[in-house]
A protein has these predicted regions:
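N-terminal Rossmann-like NAD(P)+-binding domain of SDR-like oxidoreductases, especially those catalyzing
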Residues: 1-179
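Amphipathic terminal alpha-helices
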Residues: 4-5, 299-304
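Conserved mid-core alpha-helix of short-chain dehydrogenase/reductase
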Residues: 66, 107-112, 215, 220-223, ...
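Glycine/proline-rich active-site loop of Rossmann-fold NAD(P)-dependent oxidoreductases
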Residues: 154, 170, 179-192, 199-202, ...
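Hydrophobic alpha-helix immediately C-terminal to the catalytic Tyr-X-X-X-Lys motif of short-chain
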Residues: 155, 159, 163, 193, ...
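Conserved C-terminal active-site "lid" loop/helix of NAD(P)H-dependent oxidoreductases
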Residues: 218, 250, 274-295, 301
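Non-catalytic, hydrophobic alpha-helical segments
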Residues: 221, 225, 241, 252, ...
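Terminal hydrophobic/aromatic helix or amphipathic segment near a protein terminus
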Residues: 259-283
Length: 304
């Protein structure tokens, strides 16, 4: 069955709002849920307030009864869960909200999947694999998270799988690499670079700047996720979502400086490294390649 009536959590956030745009552009009905924390932006949903296929609910995904009412009243036939706390630095300062949203919130959603027999697309992260020195992780590799954020995301995956196994539920799991693009919260690396350059301030660079991440433009990411939802029949599988575009932080900054026509010079300030900073994330993308039916965006084009 093709999914056409979605409960979309985190719809006012960075990636979730792009998923909202895409779902509505395909004519689907979306009941959007967002707790409206600092990482959400009202403008991300305002543009759709006159669309009859969109309803917005300011709600915490931990509110199991509230979510259940939304699902029942709007004939939802699929949940897409982007709702999460995601900033690693924040998880080091305090991890209670990460446990609430990323673990308890997922447990709440899975209770509704069980009670109402609804499939879920759970959005996770490549960070659940932990760092890797050489090679890349595939979907079958074990999880070995090394920070509080990735630990809560790994726990959430286990909760989804446990519910599915125990109660015969359908799901699909997506492990994304580093997204960037329009609407990203200012705390993230690429927006920090842009903000620093525009304000004539130095770009803070952790450690030696050699930490490697795998970058993907947000609109490419949500298109792939949409195709996973529509064409994989919720087969209780995991899909890495990556374009295998690995760059260390120095290279990312240099690309941004080239874009703005600036020299390295005094633009960068090396700062103390993040506690427990993972050196490199890398995932394979063989499993999802056949789902890319569009021209993907290079990093150089994505930052324009």
């Amino acid at each position: 069955m093709k999914m056409n009536r979605f409960l979309l959590t985190g719809c006012a956030g960075f990636i979730g709002s792009h998923a909202l745009d895409l779902l509505l552009s395909h004519g689907h009905f979306v009941a959007g849920v967002d707790k409206m924390t600092y990482a959400a932006d009202e403008e991300n949903i305002k543009r759709h307030e006159s669309n009859p296929n969109f309803k917005f609910f300011e709600l915490d995904i931990c509110d199991q009864a509230g979510i259940k009412n939304i699902i029942q009243e709007n004939n939802i036939n699929c949940i897409i869960n982007f709702g999460a706390e995601t900033h690693v630095d924040n998880s080091i300062l305090g991890n209670n909200c990460f446990i609430d949203s990323n673990i308890t919130g997922v447990k709440s959603l899975m209770e509704n999947c069980k009670d109402l027999n609804i499939p879920i697309c759970h959005i996770s992260t490549d960070e659940v694999y932990g760092p890797i020195k050489d090679g890349s992780f595939s979907e079958n590799d074990k999880l070995s998270p090394k920070n509080f954020y990735s630990a809560t995301k790994a726990a959430a995956e286990h909760i989804v799988c446990a519910y599915a196994n125990t109660f015969d539920l359908d799901y699909v799991m997506v492990r994304m690499s580093n997204n960037y693009g329009p609407r990203q919260n200012s705390e993230k690396f690429v927006p920090t670079i842009i903000r620093s350059l525009k304000n004539n301030k130095k770009i803070p660079l952790y450690g030696d700047g050699k930490n490697v991440r795998d970058w993907i433009y947000v609109e490419d990411s949500v298109k792939i996720i949409y195709n996973i939802i529509q064409f994989t029949s919720f087969n209780n599988e995991v899909y890495n979502v990556s374009l295998c575009d690995e760059r260390n932080n120095v290279e990312v900054i240099q690309t941004m400086l080239d874009h703005f026509g600036l020299e390295w010079g005094d633009c960068v300030e090396f700062v103390d490294d993040r506690l427990g900073h993972d050196s490199r994330y890398s995932i394979t993308n063989h499993k999802m390649l056949h789902l890319i039916d569009f021209k993907t965006t290079s990093f150089e084009d994505g930052i324009r």
